[in-house]
Amino acid sequence: MEKTKTSPLSFIKKWCYDKRLYFLVFFLPVAIMFSAYAFFKIHPIGDSSVLVLDLNGQYVYYYEQFRDAFHGNGSFIYNWSRNLSGEMFGVFAYYLASPFMLILVLLPRTMMATSILILQLAKIGTAAVTFMFFLKKISVQKPKTISLIIFPTMYALMSYMVVQLMDPMWLDGLIYLPLICWGVHRLVDEGKLVPYIVPLALMFIAHFYIGYMVGIFTFFYFCWYCLSREGRILPKKFFSRCVAFGIGTLVALMCAAFVLITVYNSLKLGKFEFTDPDFSLATQFDFLTFITKLFPMSYDTVYPEGMPMIYCGTAVLILVPLFFMNDRITMKEKTSTGLLTFLLVILMLSLIHI
């Protein structure tokens, strides 16, 4: 029997219809953020601009250099316009390695401020999409549509995301993290390495600095999932999964080695001399003050003396107690989740001052 051929247009229409919830989740936080920009008269609505602090005094010039190099008017390796000239790859790896940087090369150089705004909104929307993907994949039962809309929106508009829009290179961590955590689930449940290796390697390539922090959290998440998942993991299987986790992490690092090794050599040229860590025990802030950051309108500063940016919606204040009161959630899941939360809070207190 002859199969009916599907036209490309029909295929695209069907694909868009099937993925309509992903499109909604992408554009909802984007629309909210753009509305906030419009309210504050940010260009192109008003005369203000997204170019603030380091984004205005430093990053935008790197972006222009990146765009010029992409169009053949410069180099990704060496830059003669730096003070007395200098290598460029270290700058590229820290500020410019994100795939979202391609947005800046598609629009004219005169529209740089608009390009950066689009880049910011694209990262917000993509973070919501990857988080929704994660929720759909890990849910035992089919999640409700409203949950797949609300929680990704809260994730994409958490205070860290909004505040760090002025440091857009740091936002890739929120995009790759749900994919990496899903990879951890696949590794523990099925022993598959590729879903874990690929997003982790991409994270290290996109931004090595945020990448190592994501890697540390991934280790904690791996331990949490092994302890909290349904069904007991036999010691032999647990050991094999730990070995697989270590191998997968090593392979991801090797995949990103062309960036990591070059960055290390770049830092040896001078950046290491600016670090003066103090490993004495010290707390950065009062715990009660820390609690206030769970509420809206609690932003203080982006400077080191500022508090952690942990606000992700007032619903959390209700849902967290309900989680621990829910009888359908096992005690081992509550215990492991409580331990992980406690560990993260302790780490944010920064007992070792660096």
State where each predicted segment sits.
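Periplasmic/ER-lumenal interhelical loops and adjacent helix-loop junctions
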Residues: 53, 57-68, 99, 237, ...
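Conserved small/polar residues in nucleotide/adenosyl-binding loops
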Residues: 352-354
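Hydrophobic core of alpha-helical transmembrane segments in multi-pass integral membrane proteins
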Residues: 26-37, 317-321, 345-348
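Membrane-embedded helix bundles of polyisoprenyl
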Residues: 30, 124-137, 144-188, 192-228, ...
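Structural signal for the C-terminal ends of transmembrane alpha-helices
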Residues: 36, 107, 136-139, 183-189, ...
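Active-site lumenal/periplasmic loops and adjacent helix-entry segments of GT-C-fold
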Residues: 37-138, 142-178, 202, 206, ...
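Membrane-interfacial loop-to-transmembrane alpha-helix junctions, especially the N-terminal start
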Residues: 21, 143-148, 191-196, 245, ...
